[in-house]
Amino acid sequence: MKKVFGIAAIVLSFSAVAFADESGLLDKNSGIITKPSKLSVTETMDRVEAAAKGIGANIFARVDYQQLSKKVNVDIRPNQLLIFGRGAAAPYLIKEAPLAGIDMPFKALVWEDSQGKVWVSHTNGSFIDTRYAVKGAASYVKNVDEVIEKIVSEALK
């Protein structure tokens, strides 16, 4: 089961990027924003984690998929997931749309592509709003976007 989960997460993390704007690269189908990093996966994730802690977020997990893949004798490029949150948006959204729990708490994925380039990816809050159409969620979604943007921008300085 862990092998299937790990492989599925890796496949999802490498979805095609379809649109670029001032906020980064956005895959319009998945709602994932992706930005480049000049650092290694580990260094970038260390900075993402520090930035999340810096705004008072709780760190729930940091998953190193490359390390996990070694346990099943699969060789993958560096790929780490951080699960974090402050608890403001999730309860409201989940109360109104229980399936929103699949997208909460926040997640940031730092990964290396086949060219050795490192990327930071996260879900666009507006996509979450569209997916669940929770009435009155606009302020929560705006907060989600602002918090994640602040964390990623700080990490990529």
Spell out what each predicted region is.
Residues 38-43, 60, 135-142:
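Soluble non-cytosolic domains of exported or imported proteins
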Residues 20-56:
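Terminal, regulation- and interaction-focused segments at domain boundaries
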Residues 107-134:
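Beta-strand/loop substructures that line and gate deep hydrophobic ligand-binding cavities in soluble
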Residues 1-4:
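Positively charged n-region of N-terminal signal peptides that target proteins for export
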Residues 13-18:
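N-terminal signal peptide c-region/cleavage motif recognized by signal peptidases
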Residues 42-45, 49, 66, 145, ...:
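Extracytoplasmic/secreted envelope proteins and their assembly/folding machinery
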Residues 49, 53-55, 60-106, 110:
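Compact, glycine-rich, soluble single-domain proteins
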Residues 126-157:
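C-terminal partner/receptor-binding element of secreted or periplasmic proteins
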